[in-house]
A protein has these predicted regions:
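Interaction-mediating elements
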Residues: 1-111
């Protein structure tokens, strides 16, 4: 909590650096403690978007509590566009708010 899932057809050369930067960025953006941030990065995928196989990215953010998607969509898109060198019009972001009783860690749910 939160979970950031990054899927892209671009091959990432500096995976560990991207994971570290993304962890700090998402923690700050969502105002959540970084020690609870989990990131899943899947690169080099076969992806097709807007009629082409050009570089694209799907960002999925799941978090307990309210997500102000209107306010954070732009900075998230800008961050990943810059880090992955993918135009913002080739990035989808999916937000999902999760009830605290549906997310568990260390033998118990958060709610």
């Amino acid at each position: 909590m939160p979970l950031l899932n990054i899927s892209t057809n671009r091959k990432i050369k500096n995976e560990k650096e991207l994971l570290s930067k993304s962890s700090y960025f998402i923690s700050s953006t969502l105002n959540k403690p970084e020690n609870f941030v989990m990131i899943k990065l899947t690169d080099g995928l076969m992806m097709h978007f807007a009629g082409t196989n050009e570089h694209c990215c799907f960002i999925e953010i799941k978090s307990i509590g309210s997500i102000n998607s209107e306010n954070i969509s732009k900075p998230i898109c800008e961050f990943f566009s810059s880090e992955l060198q993918i135009p913002p019009e080739r990035i989808y972001i999916f937000f999902q708010e999760v009830d605290s009783n549906m997310w568990a860690w260390n033998n118990q749910t958060f709610g």
